[in-house]
């Protein structure tokens, strides 16, 4: 036995030196291939402007006759710890309808073409027939680069069991965070049509996330969206920030007591061998933040409050300082009519402006979304404190879900997602992704594209009643709810999940699309993929985490690797096997 251990140790040392070169080359190759692919996509093609010009009509803030002008936003940066909050105003949001085509036939798309996600076919494939998938995110570092781990790409998703007896629209109270993996560096054209992801199962051990609510009464406990952060490059520690939620409901799904939502952290480790990816840990779950009722609305103020979706990052303008953005609502009792002229944002003497009383009379004050900010107060990211919201949407919208920070050409972009059905009375917009641009993490953020905020929406007829994803209107565009939960990735790639296409429910990953960004405007890149649609679930890493020590340990620690049995064979044969795997 001692002789075998010495053989394994010697083999480990030999592999370590060789793997350093092989894996390092793989990392450079992966990043180089990504850069070349993006350059090819951006190359000039006849009839398409390579940059600027008519490709980005959303740069215009000139306004539309019959509609108010958008609010004036400077994009000026402020101290992140100041109490300045930018506003997504009604004047801003009304630009969506202003730039919608009122003359289209019923059920057609009325949105600007460059801001419309291409049509998803109704015969879409599913990622896995035994699991519903919706909100999805990637393994990122503090700069939001997306990492593969020792040759594997990994994604994290909200999942539910389609065979458990509840319907697709009841999945939220049963949500568990699951993970999928696939080999890195393979173009979408060479993968299975559904993206080629293998389901790895639930990320957390059964019952682990419920410890946050130990001793409390609830009928359902679920895991909602967040982010997964690789804590050290060339390491395997992963910190998951997610929303731990608990519901206490009667048989008719009415709240007995308000739901609870706690932003929570848990630590684990990622592992990989020749055949699969797995995780260990995630047994201890640390509550980080609960809405305080001062900056962020809580359940005592509104049983329908929103507080979820943590996304963490280090601000390059403040090295070593970690921030978190999340979805919230403006604090205060639900139903109090206290929106202000500043929330409306109309310019002085604008002839098309609404009056404050008109807005309050419409009941728009029930919609008070915001995008929150917190700052870490320790190096382990296990202690945080609230800061003032980054953006408020009082009397505009009630949900600004899954916010993220995206840096591009020196600008700070906040992207978030929202529904048509959560807009306040008198304003309208499609299901899709909304964006805001400024000069720092706290800025007087300017809504993108005509000053509206809309970055990319589903094909929608804003002249026709919305309907719902579970009960679509026959007069509405059949793809108005085709996708949701968009996440903007490096290179402008955008992933999402399929909700409803021509009355077919999804619960699977949508085709990836690409948006091009130019200052305060964006445009869907129709040159990407096939008419603007890339591969289903094509979520590529743009960086590679090469953890040599972990790679070797995982190879010899798993019987599926096949290496343990070869410990006494020729080192060169084993090394050749490793090289072949990493260079496939």
UniProtKB/Swiss-Prot annotation:
Changing residue 339 to S: 60-fold decrease in kcat for sucrose hydrolysis. GO terms for molecular function: levansucrase activity. The N-terminus is blocked. The N-terminal Gln is cyclized to a pyroglutamic acid. The modification Pyrrolidone carboxylic acid is found at residue 31. The record marks 309 as: Transition state stabilizer. The keyword Aminoacyl-tRNA synthetase does not apply. Transmembrane segments: none annotated. Induction: Constitutively expressed. This is Levansucrase.
């Amino acid at each position: 036995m001692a002789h075998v251990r010495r053989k394994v140790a010697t083999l480990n040392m030999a592999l370590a030196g060789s793997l350093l070169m092989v894996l390092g080359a793989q990392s450079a190759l992966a990043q180089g291939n990504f850069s070349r692919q993006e350059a090819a996509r951006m190359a000039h093609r006849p009839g398409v402007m390579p940059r600027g010009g008519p490709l980005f009509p959303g740069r215009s803030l000139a306004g539309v006759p019959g509609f108010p002008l958008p609010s004036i936003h400077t994009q000026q940066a402020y101290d992140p710890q100041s109490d300045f909050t930018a506003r997504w105003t009604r004047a801003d949001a009304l630009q969506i309808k202003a730039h919608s085509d009122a003359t289209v036939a019923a059920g057609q798309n009325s949105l600007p073409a460059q801001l419309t996600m291409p049509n998803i076919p109704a015969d879409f494939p599913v990622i896995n027939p035994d699991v519903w998938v919706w909100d999805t995110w990637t393994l990122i570092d503090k700069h939001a680069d997306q990492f593969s781990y020792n040759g594997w790409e990994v994604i994290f998703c909200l999942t539910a069991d389609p065979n458990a007896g509840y319907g697709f629209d009841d999945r939220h109270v049963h949500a568990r965070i699951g993970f999928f993996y696939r080999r890195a560096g393979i173009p979408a054209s060479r993968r299975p049509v559904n993206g080629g992801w293998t389901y790895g199962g639930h990320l957390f051990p059964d019952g682990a996330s419920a410890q946050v609510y130990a001793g409390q009464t609830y009928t359902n406990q679920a895991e909602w969206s967040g982010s997964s952060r690789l804590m050290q490059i060339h390491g395997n520690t992963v910190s998951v920030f997610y929303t731990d939620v608990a519901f206490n409901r009667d048989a008719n799904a009415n709240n007995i007591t308000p739901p609870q939502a706690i932003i929570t952290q848990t630590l684990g480790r990622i592992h990989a061998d020749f055949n699969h990816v797995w995780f260990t840990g995630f047994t201890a779950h640390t509550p980080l933040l609960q809405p305080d009722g001062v900056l962020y609305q809580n359940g005592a103020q509104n049983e329908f409050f929103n507080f979820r979706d943590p996304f963490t990052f280090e601000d390059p303008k403040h090295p070593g300082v970690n921030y978190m953005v999340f979805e919230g609502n403006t604090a205060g009792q639900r139903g109090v009519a206290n929106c202000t002229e500043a929330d409306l944002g109309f310019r002085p003497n604008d002839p098309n402006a609404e009056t404050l009383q008109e807005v309050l009379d419409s009941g728009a004050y029930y919609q008070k979304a915001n995008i929150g900010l917190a700052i870490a107060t320790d190096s382990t990211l296990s202690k945080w404190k609230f800061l003032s919201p980054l953006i408020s949407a009082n009397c505009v919208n009630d949900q600004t879900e899954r916010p993220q920070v995206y840096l591009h050409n020196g600008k700070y972009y906040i992207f978030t997602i929202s529904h048509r059905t959560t807009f306040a009375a008198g304003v309208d917009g499609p299901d899709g992704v909304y964006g805001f641009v400024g000069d720092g993490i706290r800025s007087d953020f300017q809504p993108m594209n005509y000053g509206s905020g809309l970055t990319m929406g589903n094909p929608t007829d804003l002249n026709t009643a919305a309907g719902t994803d579970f009960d679509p209107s026959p007069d509405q565009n059949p793809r108005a709810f085709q996708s949701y939960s968009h996440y903007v990735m490096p290179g402008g790639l955008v992933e999402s999940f399929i909700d409803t296409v021509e009355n077919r429910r999804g619960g699977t990953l949508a085709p990836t699309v690409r948006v091009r960004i130019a200052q305060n405007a964006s445009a869907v890149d129709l040159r990407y993929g096939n008419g603007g649609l890339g591969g289903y679930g094509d979520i590529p890493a743009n960086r590679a985490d090469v953890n040599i020590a972990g790679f070797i340990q995982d190879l010899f620690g798993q019987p599926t690797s096949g290496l343990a049995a070869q410990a006494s064979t020729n080192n060169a044969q084993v090394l050749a096997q490793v090289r072949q795997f990493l260079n496939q």
